């Protein structure tokens, strides 16, 4: 409980910084899970640079973009009723999620030094599967998130659930 209270105080004092650092940290955890549990690399074969890339993506892309999106979404659809939550989820999953994945996957490719042609081929190959997999997890999570969770905690809640999602995204983004 002390850790949670410290997190709440930090979030109240520095909401943007804490949200971005939370996203980066949990993206890194997701990559470590991907490398160790999914890919079974072992500690000797763990790619620390890849984990750092995912942390950087979390801090520099996921945290700011998703955190900013939640603010925009709350401005576009103010309110916390079930109907408001449903509208937010539909806009999030119908508009934001496809665009986010369409940016995230090529960004990982760029950071991994892929050529534009290889990156485009990888996006065409991986995007449909990633988007379909997104729809298995996120609509229910986001519906609950938009209905039950205050705005300043949404990114943290999503990133906690996203540890599994980040593991999947890291695995998907690093298949060559």
Curated annotation (Swiss-Prot):
Record-annotated site: Determines ion selectivity: 92
Topology class, membrane: Multi-pass membrane protein
Cellular component terms (Gene Ontology): mitochondrial inner membrane; mitochondrion; peroxisome
UniProt entry tagged with the keyword Transmembrane helix: yes
InterPro entries: Mpv17_PMP22 (IPR007248)
Molecular-function GO terms, alphabetical: channel activity
TM regions (residue ranges): 18-38, 53-73, 94-114, 131-151
Compartments in which it is found: Mitochondrion inner membrane
Organs and tissues of expression: High levels in heart, kidney, and brain, intermediate levels in testis, and low levels in liver and spleen.
S-S bonds: none
Entry keyword set: Deafness, Membrane, Mitochondrion, Mitochondrion inner membrane, Transmembrane, Transmembrane helix
Domain of life: Eukaryota
Primary site of residence: mitochondrion
Null mutant phenotype: Mice lack expression of this protein resulting in the development of adult onset nephrotic syndrome and chronic renal failure. They also develop severe morphological degeneration of the inner ear. In the inner ear, mice lacking Mpv17 display degenerative changes of the cochlear structures already at the age of 2 months. The degenerative changes are patchy arranged throughout the entire length of the cochlea and involved the organ of Corti as well as the stria vascularis epithelia with alterations of the basement membrane of the capillaries.
Pfam families noted in UniProt: Mpv17_PMP22
Gene Ontology annotations of biological process type: cellular response to reactive oxygen species; glomerular basement membrane development; inner ear development; reactive oxygen species metabolic process; regulation of mitochondrial DNA metabolic process; regulation of reactive oxygen species metabolic process
Primary role: Non-selective channel that modulates the membrane potential under normal conditions and oxidative stress, and is involved in mitochondrial homeostasis. Involved in mitochondrial deoxynucleoside triphosphates (dNTP) pool homeostasis and mitochondrial DNA (mtDNA) maintenance. May be involved in the regulation of reactive oxygen species metabolism and the control of oxidative phosphorylation.
Protein name as annotated: Mitochondrial inner membrane protein Mpv17
Gene for this chain: Mpv17
């Amino acid at each position: 409980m002390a850790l949670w209270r410290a997190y709440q105080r930090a979030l109240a004092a520095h909401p943007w910084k804490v949200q971005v650092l939370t996203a980066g940290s949990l993206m890194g955890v997701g990559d470590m899970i991907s490398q160790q549990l999914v890919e079974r690399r072992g500690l000797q074969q763990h790619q620390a640079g890849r984990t750092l890339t995912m942390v950087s993506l979390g801090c520099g892309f996921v945290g700011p973009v998703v955190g900013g999106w939640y603010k925009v979404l709350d401005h576009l659809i103010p309110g916390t009723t079930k109907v408001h939550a449903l509208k937010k989820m539909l806009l999030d999953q119908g508009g934001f999620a496809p665009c986010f994945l369409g940016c995230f996957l090529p960004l990982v490719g760029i950071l991994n030094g892929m050529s534009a042609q290889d990156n485009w081929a990888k996006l065409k190959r991986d995007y449909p599967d990633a988007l379909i997999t997104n729809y298995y997890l996120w609509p229910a999570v986001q519906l609950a998130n938009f209905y039950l969770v205050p705005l300043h905690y949404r990114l943290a809640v999503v990133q906690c659930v996203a540890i599994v999602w980040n593991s999947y995204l890291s695995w998907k983004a690093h298949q060559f």
